[in-house]
Regions:
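Active-site neighborhood of divalent metal-dependent phosphoester bond hydrolases
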Residues: 64-163, 172, 194
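Binuclear metal-dependent phosphoesterase catalytic core
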Residues: 242-323
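Acidic, His/Gly-enriched loop-helix segments that form or flank divalent-metal centers
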Residues: 123-264, 270
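A short helix->loop->beta-strand "cap" motif at the edges of active sites that frequently abuts
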Residues: 53, 83-87, 244
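Short, glycine/acidic-enriched loop or turn micro-motifs at the edges of active sites
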Residues: 33-35, 63, 96, 170, ...
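N-terminal active-site segment of His-dependent metallophosphoesterases
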Residues: 1-74
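Active-site neighborhood of phospho(di)ester-bond hydrolases with catalytic His/Asp-centered motifs
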Residues: 28-30, 55-59, 88-93, 218-223, ...
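A short acidic-Thr-Gly-centered motif at the start of a beta-strand
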Residues: 14-22, 44-48, 73-80, 153-161, ...
Length: 323
C-alpha cells in the first residue's frame, strides 16, 4: 500500500491524514495494549489478503500486553501476520512515557541507567521495554515517531467529512477543533504540557454530551465504554457509544491481560468483565455508517468474533448533546 508523502502531515503534537483519494477500508482502534495476536486474528477474520486496510488508533498501544514489541514491529513494517495494514496512532499515556526512552542527546538519556520516571513507567505496564535491546528499541521508536504519535489527529475523507482522534479526551484550547489543532501546531512543549493531561487522561466528553465543532466526529479511547454506558444508564453491551459527537471505543482489551497491580491503574479504568479488541469500520457511502468488529474474550477463556452494524441513532448507543 503506497501513500503520497503529502497525504499525511505530521508535527510533534498534531497530525493530518488526507484520505480523500483512498478507496480501501478504514478502521478505528482503541487501546490494544500489546495484544498483537488477537488483533491479527481479528484482522484476518474480517478482511481479504488483497484489500487495502488503514487503522487509526487512540494510543496506549503496547503497555501491559503480551506482545508489545511484535505490535511495534508490525506498525513500523505495515505487515500484520502476512496481512498489509497501515496504522497511524495518537500518543496515549504509554507512548508519552515511551518517547522519553530516546536520548535528548547522545550523552544524556532520560531513563539511563534508571530513574524514578523509568520505574514509574515500569510499574504502570512498561516493564516490557527492559527485555529489549536498547539500541534496537530506540531505532524502532524513531521509526514510529517519524510517522505518528501526535496528541491530536485529524482525518480528511471525501464528501467533506473530517474526523478527529485523541487518546482519552478532547479539550478546546481555542474555540473549535480546527483552532485547537492550530494552537497545538504552534505551541512549544511547555505550552502543550499545560493541556496534555486532559488529552491523555480526561473524561469530560464521556460525562457531558457536547458537540465539538469543525469535525463530524471525535474518536476517543482509554475510558471504558461500559463505565460510560453505566454512568448514562445505557445497556452494558460493551459496544462503542456516542456522547455528543464523541465516539468512545475502548472495549477493555487491557483486561485481556493479567493485571498484577490493578490499584496502580489510573483512575477511571474499572475492570471490564468480558473484554474485547474492537475495530470500528467507517463505511463511506451516500450515508456514512459504522460497523463494529470485535474479538471477545469470554469468561470461559474462549475467544469469539462478532461483527454487527453500530447504530448510532439508537437510544442504546447515543446520548445527544443538549444546547
Amino acid at each position: 500500500m503506497q501513500f503520497q508523502k503529502e497525504a499525511f502531515m505530521a508535527s510533534e503534537h498534531v497530525q493530518t491524514i488526507d484520505l480523500t483519494n483512498f478507496s480501501g477500508r478504514v478502521f478505528f482502534l482503541a487501546d490494544p495494549h500489546g495484544h498483537y495476536s488477537t488483533l491479527c486474528n481479528l484482522i484476518h477474520s474480517i478482511s481479504e489478503p488483497d484489500e487495502e486496510l488503514i487503522v487509526f488508533s487512540t494510543g496506549n498501544l503496547f503497555d501491559y500486553g503480551p506482545e508489545p514489541m511484535e505490535l511495534m514491529t508490525a506498525i513500523n513494517t505495515g505487515i500484520f501476520d502476512g496481512r498489509s495494514v497501515r496504522v497511524f496512532s495518537a500518543a496515549g499515556a504509554g507512548e508519552e512515557m515511551l518517547k522519553k526512552l530516546l536520548p535528548i542527546n547522545k550523552d544524556r538519556r532520560t531513563y539511563y541507567p534508571s530513574t524514578f520516571l523509568n520505574e514509574r513507567w515500569c510499574a504502570r505496564g512498561g516493564r516490557w521495554h527492559k527485555q529489549i535491546n536498547r539500541n534496537y528499541l530506540e531505532e524502532e521508536i524513531c521509526k514510529l515517531l517519524s510517522t505518528q504519535l501526535a496528541t491530536v489527529m485529524k482525518m480528511l475523507f471525501k464528501g467533506n467529512i473530517s474526523i478527529g482522534i485523541c487518546p482519552s479526551d478532547y479539550t478546546d484550547i481555542r474555540q473549535g477543533f480546527n483552532n485547537t489543532y492550530n494552537a497545538l501546531l504552534a505551541f512549544n512543549q511547555a505550552n502543550v504540557n499545560i493541556f496534555q493531561s486532559q488529552f491523555l487522561y480526561g473524561m469530560d466528553h464521556a460525562v457531558r454530551p457536547v458537540n465539538v465543532s469543525d469535525v463530524n466526529l471525535v474518536v476517543l479511547g482509554r475510558n471504558p465504554v461500559n463505565s460510560i454506558r453505566k454512568a448514562h444508564g445505557l445497556p452494558l453491551t460493551n459496544l462503542p457509544v456516542l456522547i455528543g459527537n464523541c465516539l468512545h471505543i475502548n472495549t477493555g482489551s487491557l483486561y485481556m491481560s493479567e493485571i498484577s497491580s490493578p490499584a496502580l491503574l489510573a483512575p477511571g479504568i474499572p475492570p471490564t468483565t468480558v473484554p474485547a479488541i474492537t475495530l470500528v469500520e467507517l463505511i463511506l457511502a451516500s450515508t456514512p455508517t459504522l460497523i463494529c468488529h470485535q474479538m471477545i474474550l469470554n469468561k470461559n477463556g474462549i475467544y469469539t468474533q462478532n461483527t454487527a452494524p453500530l447504530n448510532l441513532d439508537s437510544n442504546d448507543n447515543n446520548i445527544e448533546a443538549t444546547l
